[in-house]
Amino acid sequence: MVEMSTGTTNLVRTLDSMDFLKMDRRTFMKAVSALGATAFLGTYQTEIVNALEFAETKVIWIHGSECTGCSESVLNGGNPDIVQALTKLNVNLAYHETLCMQQGIWNDGELVNTSELNSEILLEDLYKEGNYILVVEGSIPNGPDGSGRYLVIGNKTFKETLGEAAKNANAIVAVGACACWGGITSADSDIEKDTDYRGVAFKKTDASKGMLKELGIDKPVINIPGCPCHPDWVLLTLGAVILGKIKIPDDLPAALDQYGRPKVFFPPDHTVHENCPRRGYYDRGEFDTEVGGEKCLWKLGCKAPYAHADCGIRRWNGSVSMCTQAGGPCINCVDPGFPDASRPLYVEAEDKGIVGANIDTIAKVAVGAAAVAAGVHAVRRMGKGE
């Protein structure tokens, strides 16, 4: 554990010498509390911007079965934005199916022309060269019957594409719930067994059914879940890998949780609920029963007490809002069981309570809860030297 001074100048100096993906939760919370989320991220943005020249890092970003929402989220990032990240880190985004012009020229079943005009040849050349970071967005169908032919791109199944891309990758990052563990496409249904959609390293919570395992490829994967994922989670993770802040595979056991998620963004022992902007209403036992209110959203199906992510600290849309702040109950889209574990999305989970207590009991002891909350906030203020 790293002890830190609460003085801002000393804190910034301390942060400059730290690897943020290796911070424990206490250190991370102290840093964010002292600097604020925007300033905290800005500290690392400055580190990136002022870094020495790097050798070019190639990134190959491939898409399976998905809605491209995670790419859109990353493109909307602002601290740093995608252009800053690519430019300052000297990243060559060699392939991205949404951003690159797609062409496939075939003649009698054979690829023809050059990599400049044929994206299929470009990918094959990149795979052979190796030395790249592979980003995977979207799930991978294994069906029907293990063939993977429910998703074919350029006369090749995406299952084959993933296998070819993963073999020579220096690092593999799964972006979004679908790539991490199947997501929406692997939701329980009458056809799920036939389609058999999987994540790169997991199928829901089962690591034995990840697609790399199916392909016989033994490589670690960094999972950045969410539906969509937060742009900071993606860009800061890629930045940490490129800058050498996290060594693969040596540092991964300490930096990642049991599902391959960076602990600094997805803390195992803390939840979205703890830093929810509506938390005060929960402490007082005040709950909305209809949409459009301003109180706690638990009775409208909010899953924040079970969602392990830093949304309440980081916020979205330029660090100004988040789902619950905007009036939408958290659906715990970062969980390996999503979406099935979150269903029904907008109905109170009557068989569950928050921290082991029935929610109606919480309401009956609202005065006591408020007192406890006041004490917690007082301790936090003392910890910041206020």
Curated annotation (Swiss-Prot):
PROSITE patterns: TAT
Membrane topology: Peripheral membrane protein
GO cellular component, one term: ferredoxin hydrogenase complex
Family membership noted in the UniProt record: Belongs to the [NiFe]/[NiFeSe] hydrogenase small subunit family.
EC number(s) recorded for this UniProt protein: 1.12.98.3
Co-factor(s): [4Fe-4S] cluster; [3Fe-4S] cluster
Organism: Methanosarcina mazei (strain ATCC BAA-159 / DSM 3647 / Goe1 / Go1 / JCM 11833 / OCM 88) (Methanosarcina frisia)
Binding-site positions, [4Fe-4S] cluster 2: 273, 276, 296, 302
The name this protein goes by in its record: F420 non-reducing hydrogenase I small subunit
Assembly: Composed of a large subunit (VhoA), a small subunit (VhoG) and a cytochrome subunit (VhoC).
Function statement: Part of the F420 non-reducing hydrogenase I complex that catalyzes the reduction of methanophenazine to dihydromethanophenazine.
